[in-house]
Amino acid sequence: MINLAVVFLIIAVIAALLGVTGVAGMAAEMAWILFVIGIVLAIVFWVLGRRPPPM
């Protein structure tokens, strides 16, 4: 998930350098969304992984 966020961030930077601001904004927003989802999932799995298995 974080890998996709990095890819979209790179696309956003390249698009911004080329002057395509619409694509840059959209790619940056997608990178931010994927980054937040990745962090939230990492925290959820970290918390759930610490519980003992149900009996």
Swiss-Prot record:
One of its GO terms (cellular component) is plasma membrane. It is found in: Cell membrane. The chain crosses the membrane at residues 4-24, 28-48. Keywords: Cell membrane, Membrane, Transmembrane, Transmembrane helix. Coiled coil: none annotated. It is a multi-pass membrane protein. The keyword Cell cycle does not apply. Belongs to the UPF0391 family. This is UPF0391 membrane protein Neut_2351/Neut_2360.
